[in-house]
Design a protein with these regions (language model features):
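Eukaryotic scaffold repeat domains enriched in small/polar residues
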Residues: 17-318
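Structural motif marking the loop-to-transmembrane transition
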Residues: 4-5, 288
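Bacterial N-terminal signal peptides
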Residues: 5-15
Length: 318
């Protein structure tokens, strides 16, 4: 009897604590074992995922390196880029000795692989096979001019233009052509209409530039010239944003308003109205850092906390 009252007291105290419960949303049927990583592989924090024109899934992970400041200066000795077939079988891996603290990975229309490195303060462009082709920024040097970055986070593309979410230090979008020539930039740190607090993810579709204004808990939509078109508040902190082929866009929240980790996927209509919400957490701790959506609706989440790739079927047309 005493234990019964003790349980009731604990439940009552929890209810009166004022801490809201987690958002109730339908749970996605998540597969946490999709990636067939060979035994003995040094596998660590999974930070980014994207899909090439052949349907290969590129995964960026930090191997033995963890996000801890101050960052080391030595490159990661093991491969950090893994290319999987749609069924999860490993096709190739590369990138050993190239990056120090890799963050974002994006594949362009020519299947070039772009990686941001927040320690190197650079954006690296690789051929599909991992050959380094171009480097933007000065290694290890932060700055806010046309030739330097402030911990760049992500990359997106529109024709010959390359849009970079820059980033943890600069709170701006900076645009180059494909050969690395500076074109323009916009954004400044702040919480007001024109401010940005950590542009963590960027995507471009149909002349609209989608930016996850992470620490302001909102998605900002611009024209390609940098004109602010729309601002959409999100209940949690959006770590990634992706346009949908059917129109509208999807966002991924890795933290809710109470700073609890998770993976909430929201589907938004083109007019900014919320269409659907899914809880895409896997078993155990989950923190969705990035995601990608294949043509058939298969979705891939880079789970930086669970050190894995989560997959589930998403039908944006529902």
């Amino acid at each position: 009897m005493r234990s019964h009252w003790l349980v009731l007291a604990i439940l009552f105290a929890s209810a009166c604590s004022g801490v809201p419960q987690r958002e109730e949303a339908p749970r996605a049927a998540v597969d946490a074992d999709w990636a067939q990583v060979p035994e003995g592989t040094v596998w660590g924090e999974v930070t980014a995922v994207d899909i090439d024109s052949h349907g290969h899934v590129f995964v960026l992970q930090r191997a033995s390196r963890v996000w801890q400041e101050p960052f080391p200066a030595e490159p990661i000795a093991e491969p950090v880029v893994f290319m999987f077939a749609r069924d999860g079988k490993l096709v190739a891996s590369w990138g050993a000795g190239e990056t120090v603290m890799p963050h974002g990975l994006s594949v362009d229309a020519e299947d070039k692989v772009w990686i941001t490195d927040v320690q190197r303060e650079q954006v690296l462009r690789f051929a599909h096979d991992g050959t380094l082709e171009m480097t933007l920024g000065e290694r290890g040097v932060s700055g806010s001019d046309q030739k330097h970055f402030g911990r760049p986070a992500d990359v997106a593309f529109a024709g010959e233009q390359v849009f970079i979410a820059d980033g943890y230090g600069n709170s701006r979008v900076i645009v180059f052509d494909r050969e690395g020539h500076y074109l323009r930039q916009w954004g400044r740190e702040g919480a007001g209409k024109d401010g940005v607090a950590l542009p963590h993810s960027i995507a471009v579709e149909g002349g609209r530039v989608y930016v996850s204004d992470r620490e302001n808990a909102r998605i900002k939509i611009y024209s390609e010239a940098g004109e602010l078109l729309e601002t959409i508040a999100t209940p949690g902190y959006p770590y990634a944003v992706k346009p949908l082929e059917q129109g509208g866009f999807a966002s991924l929240e890795a933290r809710d308003a109470q700073d609890r980790n998770g993976a909430i996927v929201r589907l938004w209509r083109s007019d900014g109205r919320l269409e659907r919400v899914l809880d895409a957490r896997g078993p155990g701790e989950t923190k969705g850092h990035d995601f990608a959506i294949a043509e058939d609706g298969t979705s891939y989440i880079a789970d930086v906390e669970g050190l894995r790739v989560l997959t589930f079927a998403l039908d944006p047309s529902r």
